[in-house]
């Protein structure tokens, strides 16, 4: 698998201001609905879809390093995506000189 990096913000400070006092926000990066999570001064990007039954995680809460689905209360580790025998896709964030990038895996023969 390869990773394609997509620029999505200017800086971590911009993200802090955008989130204000919220912990989570649904955003779209390259036509993908993702959830931006701010927890313990770290930022995470996860798929905005619970792997349990496909519900959106827009109203999820963050507890003890886990994102908790508001519908069925399944919790998923923010760093690994693991939880309840299921796996929530998470995406790396990389800071470069010109901004913040989200990494999305893709398959390529070359």
Can you describe what each PLM-predicted range is?
Residues 35, 69, 85:
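Short, electropositive, low-hydrophobicity segments enriched in small/polar residues
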Residues 50, 69-72:
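Short cysteine clusters
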Residues 55, 73-75:
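Flexible, glycine-rich terminal cap/loop adjacent to redox cofactors
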Residues 58, 77-78:
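Short beta-strand His + acidic residue motifs that chelate non-heme Fe in jelly-roll/DSBH
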Residues 60-66, 82-87:
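Short linker/helix segments within small regulatory modules
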Residues 78-81, 86-94:
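Low-complexity, intrinsically disordered Gly/Pro/Thr-rich segments
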């Amino acid at each position: 698998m390869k990773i394609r990096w997509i620029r999505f913000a200017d800086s971590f400070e911009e993200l802090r201001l955008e989130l204000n006092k919220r912990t989570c926000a649904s955003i779209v990066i390259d036509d993908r609905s993702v959830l931006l999570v701010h927890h313990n001064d770290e930022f995470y990007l996860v798929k905005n879809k619970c792997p349990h039954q496909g519900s959106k995680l827009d109203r999820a809460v963050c507890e003890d390093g886990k994102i908790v689905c508001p519908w069925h209360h399944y919790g998923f580790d923010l760093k690994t995506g693991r939880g309840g025998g299921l796996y929530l896709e998470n995406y790396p964030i990389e800071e470069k000189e010109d901004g913040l990038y989200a990494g999305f895996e893709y398959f390529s023969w070359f």
